[in-house]
C-alpha cells in the first residue's frame, strides 16, 4: 500500500529485459509494478529512488515524472512550460538540459520541441527573478526528460544522469564491448543460481565476469558511483542516502563458486584484469590466456557458460566455421554444462549444431541479437535446421 511520501517512477531498460527488471524491482520492494516496452513503472519513496539507482542491474536510468501536459500546438507547448512552477525543481543559479522523445503526429522534431520548452522555462525565470538558469547539454545539474505520445507530454526528472550501465569499473575495453546492463540481464535470464561455477571462455574486457560476480555476492552495481543527478535536487537528503548505502552494503555476501574466464588475446586478458581490480573483485575472479577451442572442462560438476563471441570487425574469419567449432568444443569438452551465447550473427548461429533450450530476442546496441541457451550433456544431439 502506498504512503503519502510515495511517488511514481519509471526505470528505462533494453528490449527483452523488462521481466528481469520487474523481478529486480519486486525483490527490492517496489510497489505497483507495471511492465512497459523498454521500461517498467513502479511506486516508492525518496529512499527507494536512491536504492534503485544504486542497486538495479538492468535499469539504464530512473525517471521521476513530475507533471503532464496536453499539447498539440506550438502555443500550447510554450504556455504549458511557461506556466509550470519550475522554481520548485530548478534553481535560477543552476544549469539544466532537456531531452525529448516524440511519438506524435503533432510534432516530429525533438530538437525544436526541446528548444520551445526551454524558451517557456527560461522566460518564466526571467519574469520572476530577472535572470535565468544556464543551459548545459554536456554536464547539467538538472536534466528534464520529455516524452510526447500523441498529445500527452510527460515531464520527468532524470535522477541518474549518466546511464546506469556506467558502473565505473570499465577502464579498458575492446572493440564493441557488451553493455553492462545487457550483460547483467543475460546472466539473470540464463537461470544461473550461483550453485555452480561460471565461465566466460571469450571474456574480452571481463564484463560478464564482473557482472556475474557482483550478482553472485549481491554487490550493488553502482555502490562506488558518485555521480547521480538526484544529488542536485532541492530535496536531496544526504543523510538518507548514506543510510541507504549502508543498508544495501550490509547485504553483500561471500562467493561460494568459482568465476573464471579465458581469452586467446593477452591484451584482452590484461584489460579484464585491470577492470576486475577496479571493481574490487580481483580475489573473486580468475582470468587466463587460453584458446577456448583447446580447453576442457575442469571438473565433472555442472558449469554455467556465458559468452559473446567476437563479431564483425573484431575477427576477420569465416564465422560459419567459427560457430561450428564453438558447438563442437561445447559438445566434446564441456558436457554437463549450460551454455548461453549472445550474438547478432543469426546465420552463423545456425552452425553451432546443438539443440537449443531457449532463444530470446535482445538488442546489442542497435544490432538485433539472440541469446541462445544450450544444455550440453553426454551425447548431445545435433540440431537440424
Predicted regions: what they are:
Residues 155-189:
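SAM-dependent Rossmann-like transferase core, predominantly class I methyltransferases
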